[in-house]
Amino acid sequence: TTTTFLQIASSRSGRALLTKETGISSPKLLHWARRAELMKIKDLGRDYADLLEAVGVESVSELRRRNPESLHESMQKINIKAKIVERMPSIKRVNRWIEDSQHIEIKVSS
């Protein structure tokens, strides 16, 4: 499950074990773990996570530091070019993601 994956992949030693067992690189596992942690935020699914990644937000800690208006504007600009999502999230939703990110316990370490 995602929960089990996060428990194991949240640490370097866990990722090393997974790399040994699966052959998947540690950086790829770290990316997936950060993505899974980010997707714990309500209404933030895969497509929106892809859009956030396109503007440089790849983790909960990065989302926490963002200004909602600037982030929303960057997301709009990228989405016009790359067409990542069909429906842009509202500024209210982006603001809620940032607020909700404050309450997510970050377990994934670099």
Task: Provide a role label for each language-model segment.
Residues T1-S110:
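C-terminal extensions
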